[in-house]
């Protein structure tokens, strides 16, 4: 961190006079943060929250000083970056860091933020680039995103077949349910109508407060097994514990985990199992299509599907995965530890897809009319899901979130602003981006294809807001999922360790 302090001193020497005070405050904050990092493993660690508070206070003053200068948009961005750094350091005051990676988080977050700070500053002072070159770059990036979208739509739109000459393996459908009496009856009617020769259906009641247990029991005569869940143990989220309990109860060679709002076609399982066996896969996730048209849900639809298909995630070792519908080979899932490996993780599907990707045994497919796997979510449910998963997906790191929000704003909102201003390349970028959204929507939500022509800016702005709100909720509040808090303070401070007796 001494190098980090030196970097600020260099900036102070070349900065304008009116920026000297904010940078000096920033330097003081960094020095205090250095002391806090050094205190790890030392008796000073007992005062780490006080040190974090002082450091965050200096960063806050630095950002306010820059805002008060009012000398340009780029400098305001500079101040916003420092403000985000203040928020990140303030996590230490609330004990929101995990003890075993506290030092690493301080260091990596600092470098991410200061990369942005130095980039913004030098681009401003040296005038390395101009707006026209940025717009041209955006049009090129948008073109490549369109190409990736087309490639992935072809890759994940698999023509499935259920022609097999071997005996069908046993399959267990596993459904965790918590306070789902409004939708569970419809789902169980759907599951009990599925045609598959060796099928087991197990539904777990995850400590519901409504009529969920009674509804599950009412289908016992149709072969639905009822499992009563338990209060989450320490270190487990409720859903992950429920999924592990279902896995322990299952007897099938393959297990299919489904959310309650997913509907499976009458003949959908045979093609999925065939695809798993022919590809010798350990994991196959399915992105369900939308069942019905809901105007508001379509306008503010989750941008998650667009990102999964338009971004080259597999190139960076993280193949896309869909959590609502996941099919596993039971033996392989148990071999890696099942859900005990992700006991406190939000979005375990990403861990599993990354793990099985190392063995080239993972795949994802997009549902089609022929496959018939669908879902329907209310707008409020979509928002709740995004708040729950966005910040954990960004490593619960404000710096990573800031970078993601900045990239979204520059790519999508920047392109639209340039197009409205009359830029040809800005218009080209907008056409490419809308085309990507239109293609994805036409596959997963065909009835809303017309909405996808104009809803992209709304989706992006909504996603940016939800990402920031997710961060605020996780770091300084609570995140409730089905009336259960899933956000826990993760660092406990023990000022003085007890002596070990011989």
Predicted segment positions?
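Catalytic donor/gating beta->alpha subdomain of glycosyltransferases that bind UDP-sugars
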Residues: 276-279, 283-307, 331-334, 339-401, ...
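Short beta-strand-to-loop acidic/aromatic patch adjacent to the donor-nucleotide binding site
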Residues: 252-263
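Long helical/loop segments within the catalytic core of UDP-sugar-dependent glycosyltransferases
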Residues: 227-248, 272-340, 383, 390, ...
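Membrane-embedded multi-pass helical conduit in multi-pass membrane proteins
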Residues: 13-23, 38-49, 62-75, 91-98, ...
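Short, acidic, metal-binding catalytic loop of nucleotide-sugar glycosyltransferases
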Residues: 189-198
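Cell-envelope/extracellular polymer assembly enzymes that use nucleotide-activated donors
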Residues: 169-172, 200
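Acidic helix N-cap motif at the loop->helix transition within catalytic regions
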Residues: 183-186, 210-219
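A conserved acidic beta->alpha catalytic loop
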Residues: 205-214, 230-231, 262
């Amino acid at each position: 961190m001494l190098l980090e302090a030196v970097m600020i001193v260099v900036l102070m020497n070349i900065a304008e006079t009116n920026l000297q005070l904010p940078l000096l405050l920033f330097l003081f904050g960094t020095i205090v943060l250095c002391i806090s990092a050094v205190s790890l493993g030392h008796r000073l660690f007992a005062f780490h929250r006080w040190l974090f508070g002082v450091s965050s206070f200096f960063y806050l003053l630095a950002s306010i000083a820059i805002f008060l200068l009012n000398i340009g948009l780029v400098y305001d961005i500079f101040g916003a970056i420092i403000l985000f750094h203040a928020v990140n350091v303030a996590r230490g005051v609330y004990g929101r860091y995990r003890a075993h990676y506290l030092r690493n988080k301080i260091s990596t977050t600092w470098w991410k933020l200061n990369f942005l700070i130095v980039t913004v500053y030098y681009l401003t002072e040296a005038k390395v680039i101009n707006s026209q070159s940025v717009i041209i770059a955006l049009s090129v990036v948008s073109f490549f995103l369109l190409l990736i979208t087309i490639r992935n739509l072809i890759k994940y739109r698999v023509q499935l077949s259920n022609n097999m000459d071997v005996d069908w393996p046993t399959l267990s459908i596993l459904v965790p349910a918590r306070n789902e009496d409004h939708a569970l009856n419809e789902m169980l009617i759907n599951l009990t109508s599925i045609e598959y020769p060796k099928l087991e259906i197990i539904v777990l009641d995850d400590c519901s407060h409504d009529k969920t247990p009674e509804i599950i029991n009412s289908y016992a005569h149709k072969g639905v097994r009822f499992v009563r869940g338990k209060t989450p143990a320490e270190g487990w989220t409720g859903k992950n514990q429920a999924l592990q309990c279902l896995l322990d109860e299952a007897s099938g060679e393959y297990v299919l985990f489904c959310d309650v709002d997913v509907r499976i076609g009458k003949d959908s399982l045979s093609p999925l199992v065939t695809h798993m066996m022919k590809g010798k896969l350990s994991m196959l996730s399915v992105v369900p299509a939308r069942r019905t048209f809901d105007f508001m849900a379509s306008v503010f639809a989750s941008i998650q599907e667009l990102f999964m298909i338009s971004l080259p995630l597999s190139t960076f070792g993280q193949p896309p995965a869909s959590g609502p519908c996941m099919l596993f080979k039971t033996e392989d899932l148990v071999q890696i530890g099942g859900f005990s490996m992700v006991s406190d993780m939000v979005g375990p599907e990403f861990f599993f897809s990354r793990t099985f990707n190392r063995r080239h045994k993972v795949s994802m497919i997009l549902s089609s009319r022929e496959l018939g796997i669908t879902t329907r979510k209310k707008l409020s449910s979509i928002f709740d899901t995004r708040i729950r998963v966005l910040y954990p997906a960004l490593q619960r790191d404000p710096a990573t979130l800031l970078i993601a929000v900045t990239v979204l704003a520059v790519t999508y909102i920047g392109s639209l602003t340039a197009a409205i201003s009359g830029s040809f390349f800005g218009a080209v970028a907008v056409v490419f981006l809308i085309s990507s959204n239109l293609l994805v929507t036409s596959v997963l939500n065909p009835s809303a294809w017309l909405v996808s022509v104009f809803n992209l800016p709304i989706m992006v702005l909504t996603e940016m807001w939800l990402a920031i709100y997710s961060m605020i909720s996780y770091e300084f509040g609570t995140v409730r999922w089905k009336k259960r808090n899933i956000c826990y303070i993760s660092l406990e401070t023990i000022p003085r360790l007890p002596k070990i007796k011989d």
